[in-house]
Amino acid sequence: YTKGKNATEMAMLIDAMDILYGERMDGFCLVSSDSDFTPLAQRIRQEGLTVYGFGERKTPTAFVRACDRFIYTEVLRKDDKTAGTVTPKRKVYSTRELKQDTRLVNLIRNAVEDSADDNGWASLGVVGQNVTNRSADFDPRNYGYKKLGELVRAIQLFEIDERSMDNSPAHNIYIRNKKRRTSNSD
């Protein structure tokens, strides 16, 4: 065997193709920040399988977009609380910073519009799926928030309605764009 990065990548590619054609899988997980895996992700998706990508923020956009879902590994790291270890805190974006992120705001607004009922309300769960379908690397943790609901609240550009579920302590969250006020009472 030849040693080195390219030899390792080639061996991984051969293994992936063997698995793709030899066994029935529901999806693949590719952990890399290397754009060399972009064609592999595209080929796997052509076969109708889901591709989950994991990599660092430096991952090239082409590879991120080739995946159905892409998660930056930085958001997966837990704060290390062991003695003598200092782990930098993840940045939590302020309301002002979030509102200025036009890509983020438009992504969520468009997802709300596409998922909304006649009064403009959309289930947060459906909005989340819609956002993920539009942007493979979307994750509220990229902005310092654990959940989409926390991020939406922090942006402060959406009305939020928590609706009780029958015979359950749980509730469903619905949101709508604040800009979209109708003259009808909702």
Residue map of PLM features:
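Terminal and domain-boundary accessory regions
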Residues: 1-186
